Structures are given as C-alpha cells and as structure tokens.
C-alpha cells in the first residue's frame, strides 16, 4: 500500500525502461531476421533465374557468383546506411 491508503501499481522507471529497451531489441532482431530471409529469397529468385539455364554451361557458376557478390555488396551498403540513420534518429530523440 502506498501513502494515504492507495495502492502503488506503477513499476519503477528503470524497470519500465529496461522492458522497453528489451522489447526494442527483440523487434530489431526480428526485423533483421526478416530482412535476411528476404535477401536470401530475392538472391535465389534473381540470380538463379538469370544465371542457370538449361542445358547447364560452364559460365553459369561464375554468373551466380558475380550475382551473389553484387547483391551482398548492395545489401551491405543499404544496411550500413539504414543503421546510421537509425542511430542518428535515436540520438536526436526521433525514435
């Protein structure tokens, strides 16, 4: 019971903040997994559709390797930019 007979149902601010941060981290991890899954699906669709032809040719493997490398370079640039924007927004209090 709190002062004057009322009940105190509020959690301490630090405990609430910890829960919020944990929830944000969980969401960020789920988004990262979803993005990685999306990347794998797009790479599979685009690179293999573009490069693997019937009948199989010796150049097909090199085409797939180059396509995968391009996707990964692009993914890295986009991810770094996204992370920087999120960090900037976090420090300015936008999120």
From Swiss-Prot:
GO terms for biological process: protein insertion into mitochondrial inner membrane. It comes from Candida glabrata (strain ATCC 2001 / BCRC 20586 / JCM 3761 / NBRC 0622 / NRRL Y-65 / CBS 138) (Yeast). The gene is TIM13. This is Mitochondrial import inner membrane translocase subunit TIM13. The keyword Ribosomal protein does not apply. The twin CX3C motif contains 4 conserved Cys residues that form 2 disulfide bonds in the mitochondrial intermembrane space. However, during the transit of TIM13 from cytoplasm into mitochondrion, the Cys residues probably coordinate zinc, thereby preventing folding and allowing its transfer across mitochondrial outer membrane. Heterohexamer; composed of 3 copies of TIM8 and 3 copies of TIM13, named soluble 70 kDa complex. Associates with the TIM22 complex, whose core is composed of TIM22 and TIM54. Interacts with the transmembrane regions of multi-pass transmembrane proteins in transit. Transmembrane segments: none annotated. A motif (Twin CX3C motif) lies at residues 47-67.
């Amino acid at each position: 019971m709190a002062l004057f007979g009322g009940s105190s149902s509020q959690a301490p601010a630090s405990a609430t903040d910890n829960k919020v941060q944990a929830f944000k981290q969980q969401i960020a991890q789920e988004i990262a997994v979803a993005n990685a899954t999306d990347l794998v699906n797009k790479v599979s669709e685009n690179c293999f559709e573009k490069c693997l032809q019937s009948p199989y040719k010796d150049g097909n493997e090199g085409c797939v390797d180059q396509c995968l490398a391009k996707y990964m370079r692009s993914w890295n640039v986009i991810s770094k930019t996204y992370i920087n924007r999120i960090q900037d927004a976090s420090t300015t209090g936008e999120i």
